[in-house]
Amino acid sequence: MSPSPAERAEDLRRQIAQANRAYHELDAPEIPDVDYDRMVRELEALEREHPELARADSPTQQVGARPSGRFPEVRHAVPMLSLSNAFSDEEVADFVRRIDERLGRRSLRFSAEPKMDGLAISLRYEDGHFVLGATRGDGSTGEDVTANLREIGDIPKRLHGKDWPDVLEVRGEVYMARADFEAYNERARLQGGKVLANPRNAAAGSLRQLDPKISAQRRLSFFAYGTGEVQGGELPDTHSGTLAQLGAWGFPVSELCKVVEGTDGLLGYYRTIGERRDGLPFDIDGVVYKLDDRAGQQAMGFVSRAPRWAIAHKFPAQEQSTTVEAIEIQIGRTGAATPVARLAPVAVAGVIVSNATLHNADQIARLDVRVGDSVIVRRAGDVIPEVVSVILDRRPQGTTPWQMPTRCPVCGSEIVREEGAAAWRCSGELSCPAQRKEAIAHFASRRAMDIDGLGDKYIETLVDAGIVKSVADLYRLSRDTLLHLKLVLDAEEPSALAAALKLHLPAEGSGAVLNAVLKLDGNDPGWRAQALAQPASFEWNTKKIATKWADNLIAAIDASRAATLERVLFALGIEHVGESTAKALAQWFGDLELIRHLPWPLFKRVPDIGGEVARSLGHFFEQQGNQQAIDDLLQVGQVRIADVHAPSAKLREGLDLAQLLVESEIPGITRLRAEKLVAALPGAQAVLDAEHGQFVNAGLPDDTARGLAEWLDADGHGAMLLAAENAMREILAKAPALAEIVAGPLDGQTVVLTGTLAQLTRDAAKERLEALGAKVSGSVSKKTSFVVAGTEAGSKLDKAQSLGVSVWDEDRLLAYLAEHE
């Protein structure tokens, strides 16, 4: 049974009052603007159709919400009213017609300006000095936020110029620019803080901080759009003139403000700003039209909460409410695991949205998004739609908090997150199809396997065609495939490709190939990959196609089969393993077969490799898909590592079970405690077999003993410790004795290169210095042994001189290398 008009009106008043409190007092909107506007318009229609239902305390007769009580109250000398809204061209035409009829004018000029999506404020100046700033509140009474407003650089503390009134109230909008909003949220995500839903919330929440220092840390901005009380002075007789005068007195005024004539001028402005909306540095939710003539404004007057001479023309809503039907994981090109909400389709900003990003697991936890929830989804321009909040009042019973899956939905590898990071990642770098293109491009890059000529477009099409599924497949590429690829990429459409192919196909059997190509849909973005996947035999007409490039690329692929260990390690694309880490791993362990089977704590034996990098290496090599990709690379691709050698003798230093326990980052296990433990329980198996009491008897504090027992019971830890002990024994068996180490002349010294060298490339100089034992760093410090400065050396040279670090020129470096190499 439908509610009566009186019951419906009461329900609408309750919902609108609740929404007003959330929006104006708590700075935490619970429903999208479009839902709010819809309820207000429905209530206005009910009160028009049933005048007996109209009440003085109705939201249709009020502005904003009462002050929160957290700040001193300020009574506005001139009320800060709201604006009526228009949502269609017809409503704008009616607005112009009403003014025309009331004033009897045929040519009406309006000041048009963007409707900022921020917080309305009033600034009071006495004798040119800023003395008071207040929020709108309920239109009559606002909150004193003067201290916070003083932290906004856009707001002048003293008026510029001259001839300002004795008392001047300036009305305007405090907002947060999009770039500042994104920077704030990025910092919050990294620090585990609260991520704000949108720039409007960010501005309002920042301005209502009790500590002005917090407001100062959040970059807020301001635009002036009008005036309130004015005493002891005159303002121009047009609104546009007043804005120009405010600009001369030091207030920011939007450059988008424009004077237009009549309905056509207003609608033209609306469409122009609408087209520019997504590219603006700030959020707007519409435009505002104001009769430019102040005398006309006074003649038009006001209704209860809004002027008759102004109206807001709203854009299509960028936020809507809908339902979460599922939460799935999407794996990006670099392995980032991004949760995506699958939504009941809803129109947002003129586009049907059925998916929205949830950014990361921390964001889901902060919002507490669950399957079945009603949520607010936001879409601004080309930005990916995102879920910004949950409507908790609509949450169905029986929902449960969402948990990040443990396995990649694409390849089944473990999904991992390093300590302190916001993003989770699929650890199947080499084997995950979602990461395939990125992994192959990195593998072939100049500083990795250096396969010159294999560009991104080639890789993309080869992968899409299913010809290259792993890095090992690069070594299966043939000259025919590459020439076929070039024809495919050069063709504008399937018919053009068929014509090009016809020149290189044998007469017998070519018809089937050409017909298959001609059937492809040229409007399908994947048609080229489909064409390349078509099997074909070729008889290349070398007068009609260049072949040298393909021969060169095949030669580059063949040449990459003989590679150094550091290049192969870097080419694998392991998270956190750059060139310098790959070089260090190669120098210290010497053999890919050893490295690929090491438990992660042993990687920490290498200087400058900490827990984060070591765990990343461990996760990578634990994935069966990655191990299979390496096997294929060595067996199918026939990649041969040219510089295999024994592990460094330096690994022997302090390498024992006690150190393994410390490197495993077991809570409370220090070197001294580990030595006591191993003295009582020699061997990893003995430690695994022991119980809490034996750990205490070995000298561990009770809480440390309990923590060790819990750690050993955790999945995989015991097996890892046993494997680490076995790997340690293998290293000790293979590494030469410490006495056999021949120290380089630069062992233990740190060198920095800066500027341009005439006779050496930066890479060549670095390689030769490292061969003599030096560590080549990218930054200068007191620990730097010397700096090699070429021409156009910059700040590094200046810093070296200020710290008293020795500076060598290129001639001295070359002489030293000639003497010691």
UniProtKB/Swiss-Prot annotation:
InterPro entries: BRCT_dom, BRCT_dom_sf, DisA/LigA_HHH, DNA_ligase, DNA_ligase_AS, DNAligase_adenylation, DNAligase_N, NA-bd_OB-fold
Enzyme Commission designation: 6.5.1.2
Top-level taxon: Bacteria
Domain called BRCT: residue spans: 741-821
Cofactor needs: Mg(2+); Mn(2+)
A GO MF term: metal ion binding
Record-linked Gene3D superfamilies: 5' to 3' exonuclease, C-terminal subdomain (1.10.150.20), 6.20.10.30, BRCT domain (3.40.50.10190), DNA ligase/mRNA capping enzyme (3.30.470.30), Helix hairpin bin (1.10.287.610), Nucleic acid-binding proteins (2.40.50.140)
Keywords (A to Z) from UniProt: DNA damage, DNA repair, DNA replication, Ligase, Magnesium, Manganese, Metal-binding, NAD, Zinc
Protein name, UniProt field: DNA ligase
Naturally occurring in which organism (per UniProt): Stenotrophomonas maltophilia (strain K279a)
